[in-house]
Amino acid sequence: MKREEKKLVKNTLLLMLGNFSSKLLVFLMVPLYTSVLTTAEYATSDLLTTTINLLYPFATLMISTAVMRFCLDKCKDSRQLLSIGIWIEFIGIAFVALGSMLFFNSGNLQGYRYYFLIGFAGYSLYTLLMEYAKGSEKVGMYSIAGVCNTVALISCNIVFLLKLGLGIKGYLMAM
């Protein structure tokens, strides 16, 4: 095999490790969630998680994907790209924080606003840094970060849900 083909195979396997293993392990956590959380708590947590995933592309203008794409262009200053990406992410997080004052003001979601904001900010910055790692061709770092994130998520879920019995708040803190 040629050098480029070996690199492609290696990078593909590392990306698969970083993505697939994380998704599989989180999928295997579903029985824990359904046994510890009530139906209403699980529905609320799913609503918050889905809302984060839906808001992210609009609030951040998908800057993480742009950072990855332009990092791959060798003539660009990748640190400057990351800096711009972080600024745009913070602006998006600020808009989401303002909007959340209306959304979380009443109803069943009262009391979850700060969990939502921290979850959104964490997801946004994590996604940006992961895309930056991919764009900088640091595929090994990308995979290690994905696995570490999954291990931290599972560990926090076990501690917060099983050991401390924090229910939905424990689930959201682990998120």
Regions found by a protein language model. Give the residues of each.
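N-terminal membrane topogenesis motif
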Residues: 1-25, 76
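Transmembrane-helix boundary and interhelical linker motifs in polytopic inner-membrane proteins
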Residues: 2-6, 34-41, 55-90, 134-140
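Hydrophobic alpha-helical transmembrane segments
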Residues: 114, 144-175
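Small-residue-rich midsections of specific transmembrane alpha-helices
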Residues: 19, 24-29, 46-71
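Residue-level recognition of pore/gate-forming positions within transmembrane alpha-helices
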Residues: 19, 23, 50-53, 89, ...
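Interfacial/gating helices of multi-pass transporter permease domains
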Residues: 30-54, 168-171
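Alpha-helical transmembrane segments of multi-pass membrane proteins
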Residues: 54, 58, 90, 94, ...
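Alpha-helical transmembrane segments and their helix-entry boundary regions
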Residues: 15, 42-43, 81, 139-145, ...
